[in-house]
Amino acid sequence: MSLRALLARLIDERRAETPLSSDDDEPEVRLAIYDSPLSEPQVVSVRGDDFHALVGETAARTYAVSRERGGRVPYGVIREIVENLIHAYFRNATVTVLDDGNAIRISDQGPGIADKVRALQPGFSTATAQMRRIIRGVGSGLPLAKEQLQFLGGTLQIEDNLERGTVVTLSVHRDPPTANTAPARVAERRHLTT
C-alpha cells in the first residue's frame, strides 16, 4: 500500500478536520536549516509515497545536516520522532535544525498530543490498527528517544504547535559531558537501597 493511500485511510479513520490538500500531492517533510539565528533558513523538501523511504530519507538528511554542523543528536532519536509524524498524517511536517545541529525541532499540524506526560512513558500510544501495520505502535518511540537524549545530557520537549499539532524539540549540549560527571553517576549507582 502506498503512503498516500495509507494516509487517506488514516484520515478517514480519524475523521480529520482538514484532509490532505490533494490526492495528487505526495506527503512532504520540509527541512529548515539555520546557519545562525539571524539568517534565513535553507529549505529542503523531502517527498515520497513510501512511508519507510520518506522517514528514512528525512531522518538521514536531518542527521547528516546536524552532524555537518557539529551536532550530537543520535540518528535513532531523530528517526523515532520523524516516524511519529504518521500520527499527524505528515500534515505540514517541518524539521528545523538549529544551534549548530544540537537542537532539532520537529513540528506538524496533526491532532496533537493531549497528555504529554503519559506520551513520554512506555506503553501509551495513539497508533491505530492501520498505523500498526507499518510502525511498532506500542508507545516506545518517545520514551526511548527521551532516555537516549538524557544519557547524553540532553532533553526532549513536547509542546503544542500554534494552532494545532505538536512540536518536539530534541537538544543536546554542544560539548559532551565531561569525565568528571561520570564517576559521580557511577558512585550513586553503587548505593542501591531496596
Question: Where are each of the predicted segments found?
Answer:
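Conserved beta-strand-loop-beta-strand hairpin that lines the nucleotide-binding pocket
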Residues: 1-38, 77-78, 83-194
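Generic detection of short hydrophobic beta-strand segments and adjacent strand-loop junctions
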Residues: 36, 40-46
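General secondary-structure edge motif
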Residues: 42, 57, 61, 65, ...
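Conserved short strand/loop->alpha-helix "switch" segment adjacent to the catalytic nucleotide/phosphoryl-transfer site
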Residues: 45-81
